[in-house]
Amino acid sequence: MTWMECFEKYGYYSLLNYETDDIEPEMEFFLENGEIPNQLREIYLSKYRDELFLILQPDRDENVKKFCQRWDNNIMAFIKFGSLPDDNRESIKKLRYNIVQVILYGIGENINGVKYMNEPDDFSEEKSTSVSRKIFIKSNDADE
């Protein structure tokens, strides 16, 4: 089962639309120069709108600590100034402590041809809860 199928199976829905290279307007804090960055594979929101998962794929030789910190900064801006699609700022209150960075790593390339980051030497970021929780998942060519 791919990670995408897993999220959809449990009622999470995507906030990205790759066909139109579009993102929900309220999620603009995760864009770079108005575009979806290569490292952002997907954003999933739970059906109860109380959990947000950012599926991220760092570049092959990227420093994991700096990568996570950069995304924590984006998440903090979203928490302070953003809102969920079709909702107001109140929705952020229950979401604030339930934002997770899912960091993909592995050997080879993802289904879009982007090379995976090698297995990190240090998984200490997984214990960090400074702004968001982090989960490292090994993936493969089929995004499984």
Question: Model segments located where?
Answer:
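"Short basic amphipathic alpha-helical interaction patches in structured regions
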Residues: 67-73, 113-127
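Generic structural hydrophobic/aromatic packing signal, biased to beta-strands
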Residues: 55, 99-103, 136
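Extended, compositionally biased accessory segments flanking or bridging domains
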Residues: 1-64
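Elongated alpha-helical scaffolds
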Residues: 94-112
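Charged, structured surface patches that assemble and position nucleic-acid processing machinery
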Residues: 37-39, 121-144
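Short acidic, S/G/P-rich loop/turn micro-motifs used as interaction or catalytic elements
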Residues: 58-66, 106-115, 141-143
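A broadly used, surface-exposed interaction patch
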Residues: 47-97
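Catalytic micro-motifs at enzyme active sites that drive phosphoryl/nucleotidyl and oxygen chemistry
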Residues: 41-43, 86-92, 118-125
